[in-house]
Amino acid sequence: MHRNQAGPVICSLLSLLAFAVAAAAEPAGSPARLAGPRNAEADAATYDRCLKLAKQNPGAAQSLAQTWHERGGAHPADHCAAVALFGLKRYKEAATRLEALAQAMTTAPAGLRADVFDQAGQAWLLAGDPVRAYAAAGQALGLQPNDPELLLDRAEAAAAVGYYDKAVADLDHVLKTDPKRTEALIYRASANRALDRLDAALADVEKALSQAPNSVPGLLERGNIRRLNGDLSGARADWERIGQLAPGTQADMAAKANIERLDLKARPPPASTSRGQ
């Protein structure tokens, strides 16, 4: 179950409107307020430029964010600095900064703070700390209860920790609102497979693939379930299909590794030889 990859997730961040709200929310004693009236349009342009730079040259974006922070950029500058750290694959530092930022934004709208906690959770996952990721996702949901995107992210963190029942519970909530959500069906299938609930897992993934027949995650998951059910030819067919749809991807590499394991098990043992015969 892998919802978020290291690339674009955290860089599709806050809108400029959210930036304006966060900047306006600075307390009276903050550097932004002490620096005197700010040009909101100029700050919005700096924020936009900083986020774009974080995708292209995160080191330069980090320098820009630091300079901007020293000049009173406050929360938006801190946010861009965290994005730059993410781009540099310094995920633990990015997660720490995002978490601190979300906690500091006490006067910002709940939805904005929830987004930043959620981004911290994504960074914690990539830092290899799913327990912190799960906690951050929980803080996000405390601010924005029942948000389906936040529930999906917490379900991923729960599965990474091994809390498969909790992952299923979050995904149940998502699917009550949107029973046809393919992504959630596949994630729930994965969690149920881990719980050895293979009938439920297969039902979910079959429904997902009936809606999206070329879903690579769905095919990978159904192959896993079919293998556990003893349907080795069906598993092979699903994994080979991934090679046609998404050659060279991580999913394709995982599928090829699964096929190799099938082939190894299918090979007869080498004939034994006895000396002197």
Task: List each language-model region with its residue ranges.
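N-terminal leader/linker segments that initiate helical-solenoid repeat arrays
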Residues: 22-80, 84, 88-96, 268-277
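Terminal, low-structured helical/coil segments at or just beyond the last alpha-helical repeat
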Residues: 31-34, 38, 234-277
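Helix-start (N-cap) detector for alpha-helical repeat units in TPR-like alpha-solenoids
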Residues: 43, 75-76, 109, 114, ...
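Residue-level recognition of tetratricopeptide repeat
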Residues: 50-51, 83, 122, 156, ...
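Register position in tetratricopeptide repeats
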Residues: 55, 87-88, 122, 126-127, ...
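Structural marker of alpha-solenoid helical repeat scaffolds
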Residues: 70-71, 104-108, 143, 177, ...
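Canonical tetratricopeptide repeat
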Residues: 80, 119, 153, 187, ...
